[in-house]
Amino acid sequence: MEARDKQVLRSLRLELGAEVLVEGLVLQYLYQEGILTENHIQEIKAQTTGLRKTMLLLDILPSRGPKAFDTFLDSLQEFPWVREKLEKAREEVTAELPTGDWMAGIPSHILSSSPSDQQINQLAQRLGPEWEPVVLSLGLSQTDIYRCKANHPHNVHSQVVEAFVRWRQRFGKQATFLSLHKGLQAVEADPSLLQHMLE
């Protein structure tokens, strides 16, 4: 779930709790769409009050993947006024958030860690032609880029993966998410690229 959507759920937590959202079809819909597991449903239903049930649902949702917030909105068919409130809050948060602000919500130990192979692979899938200026801003040379291209002449994805793996090997502990964020900012690449890697 995106940082902005987590913020919306946090800011409306008490209001949502007061609506006792778990009594209708909400849980069933979230289960059907694969957002909640059977264990989640049992855990929520075991709570003694409607407020506690809703609060537990709100605690679980942020960790249930990128589609959780939109699926939650879809589940609120019986509560159109709640859905409207959430959509409005989301628009306001989006308007307020400068692109780099979601970084503030990421723990420092993650920012100072290096991306895994899987995360580099994810980034390579999303990065377009701007990958070359990004790796140059991270400290690789034109020669490095040339080698990556020579090693994988017909596969841009593999060129990008190799370039970031070289960056990680060469810079060791300095090859962090934070330096990657700065590299993306330096070439004005889409900052949400990093967000997707960390979800």
Curated annotation (Swiss-Prot):
Gene3D superfamilies in the record: Death Domain, Fas
InterPro entries listed in its UniProt record: CARD, CARD_RAIDD, CRADD, CRADD_Death, DEATH-like_dom_sf, Death_dom
Record's keyword terms, sorted: Apoptosis, Cytoplasm, Nucleus
GO molecular-function term, one example from the UniProt record: protein-macromolecule adaptor activity
Domain CARD intervals: 1-92
Entry's localization field: Cytoplasm; Nucleus
Superkingdom to which the source organism belongs: Eukaryota
GO biological process: apoptotic signaling pathway; cellular response to mechanical stimulus; DNA damage response; DNA damage response, signal transduction by p53 class mediator; positive regulation of apoptotic process; positive regulation of apoptotic signaling pathway
An annotated GO cellular component: endopeptidase complex
Annotated signal sequence range: none
Keyword ATP-binding listed: no
Pfam annotation, one family: Death
Death domain mapped to chain residues: 116-188
Role of this protein: Adapter protein that associates with PIDD1 and the caspase CASP2 to form the PIDDosome, a complex that activates CASP2 and triggers apoptosis. Also recruits CASP2 to the TNFR-1 signaling complex through its interaction with RIPK1 and TRADD and may play a role in the tumor necrosis factor-mediated signaling pathway.
Quaternary structure annotation from Swiss-Prot or TrEMBL: Forms a complex named the PIDDosome with PIDD1 and CASP2. Interacts (via Death domain) with RIPK1 (via Death domain); the interaction is direct. Interacts with TRADD. Interacts with TNFRSF1A.
Domain notes: The Death domain mediates the interaction with PIDD1 and the formation of a complex composed of 5 PIDD1 and 7 CRADD proteins which in turn probably recruit 7 CASP2 to form the PIDDosome. The Death domain mediates a direct interaction with the Death domain of RIPK1.
Protein's recorded name: Death domain-containing protein CRADD
Species this protein is from: Mus musculus
Gene designation: Cradd
